[in-house]
Each structure stands twice: as C-alpha cells, then as structure tokens.
Amino acid sequence: MSCNNGMSFFPSNFMIQTSYEDDHPHQSPSLAPLLPSCSLPQDLHGFASFLGKRSPMEGCCDLETGNNMNGEEDYSDDGSQMGEKKRRLNMEQVKTLEKNFELGNKLEPERKMQLARALGLQPRQIAIWFQNRRARWKTKQLEKDYDTLKRQFDTLKAENDLLQTHNQKLQAEIMGLKNREQTESINLNKETEGSCSNRSDNSSDNLRLDISTAPPSNDSTLTGGHPPPPQTVGRHFFPPSPATATTTTTTMQFFQNSSSGQSMVKEENSISNMFCAMDDHSGFWPWLDQQQYN
C-alpha cells in the first residue's frame, strides 16, 4: 500500500522517462514539446496564431481596407517584394494601369471590373492604385503650377521694378520742367516790365524833346490867343511879299471878329492874297471895301 501510495505522487510515465533519459542523455526534461519558445517575435506571431487569436483572413482585410500607413506600399508601382504576405504588382500590371490612367484618371465601376479580371487582381486593389496615382498626379500638377506661377511672378516683378524706375525718372523730369517754367515766367515778367518802363521813359523823353524843340508860335499872340487859320497850298508855291504879309495879318484880325461867314471870307482872302502876290496890289482894297459894304 505504501508503495502504491508513494507512487501516486509521481506520474505514470516516470520510470519510462528516466529510462528514456538514460538512453538519450542530450535531451533534458522540459515542457518544450508542449509550449513553443517565446524568444523571437516571429515565434510570438506563431504562438498567437497557435492560440487562434489571429484569423487567417486578417491579411486580406488589411489589404482591402487601405487605411493603414503601408497601404500605398502594398500596392506600389514597383515590382519589388518587401514582405512575403504583401501582395505586390508586377511591371506588366503597373504598365497596364499607367496606360489606363493616361486615358482617364477617373475609374468607373465597369472599367474597374474589367481591369481586375484582365490583371487578375481584386477590384479594391485597382481602386486603391488609382487613388494613389491620382494623389501623386495632383502633387506633380501642383508643383508644375507652382513653378509656372513663380516664373510669372518673377517676370512681373522685374517689369514692375522697371516701371517704377521709369516712373521716378519721369517724375523727376516733370519737376525739372515745372521749375524751369517758373524761372522762365519770372524772367519774362521781368523783361516785360523792363521793356515797358524803357518804352515809357523813351516816350516821355521824346515828348520832352518835342516840347523843348518846338518853336513858339507868334500867331497866337497876334491873334489874341486864337489859333492861326490853316495854311493853304498856294502859300507854299507862291510866297507872299513883305507888303502882302502885313495886309494879311490885318485882314486876319478883322475877319476873326466877324460872326457869320468867317470861313468863306478866309478862303476868299487866301485866294485874293495868292493872286495879289502875283499881280499889282492897287485894286485889292477897293474890292474889299465893296465886299464889306455889301
């Protein structure tokens, strides 16, 4: 009984194990056959799959969601392999997809199904590749647009700088012309004032010279302040004698005192003087007395 009770504390294969250890001294008794080693990460992954916590469809779900950071790498354009479980596209598939993208960057459902059947891929893979390709195309397009706009901006900036310098030059020329016009107008005003003053001085000098050089008139004193009668043309051509000059002065004083017919008498007097200067003066006074009494 005691032996049986003592043997109950040991497993049933205890004796067999000891004999097995004697036959195989290199192997130590452990739980290695039952539990795998957890020293490496891939062993942890295997252990998790062994425990049933990772489903076999999890890799396909990761490929189809496309929300992870390595989604673009999973469906990148190159044909290199980064991992055994990542589905990569070969060069022929990439070329075919590039040609279809050049035809149209929008992917229709029918076109997606045709490409998936032709390339042997899932429709979700085709859609993700087109999304990534459109993103890269938009980025390149933005870079091209930025370069074009930057060149245009540089050109416009250079033209603006040239226009600013030209505008400053024109403003400087305008200011110079304004200053020149002001100085010229001032000089012209001074010249006109000087010429006007010179003309007034010259005219006043001329008047003074005329007044100073004019001979005094004796006729006004003889006629009692009245202006002398106008001279006729006959006097210049037929100058009178001294005797006729005295008679003309007396007759002039006589006719100036008369009221009516003074101008007619003066004309007749001048005509008679002209003829008397040429002929004898014997018949002048009787005719004049007869004219007065008439």
Curated annotation (Swiss-Prot):
Where does this protein come from, organism-wise? Answer: Arabidopsis thaliana
Q: Which cysteines form disulfides?
A: none
Which locations, inside or outside the cell, does it occupy? Nucleus
Its Gene Ontology cellular component terms are: nucleus
Family, per the entry?
Belongs to the HD-ZIP homeobox family. Class I subfamily.
The entry's note on the tissues where this protein occurs is: Predominantly expressed in leaves and flowers.
One family from Pfam that matches here is Homeodomain
Give the keywords, sorted.
DNA-binding, Homeobox, Nucleus, Transcription, Transcription regulation
GO terms for biological process?
Answer: cotyledon morphogenesis; leaf morphogenesis; primary root development; response to sucrose
Which residue windows does the record flag with biased composition (Low complexity)? 197-210
Chief localization? nucleus
Q: What is this protein called?
A: Homeobox-leucine zipper protein ATHB-13
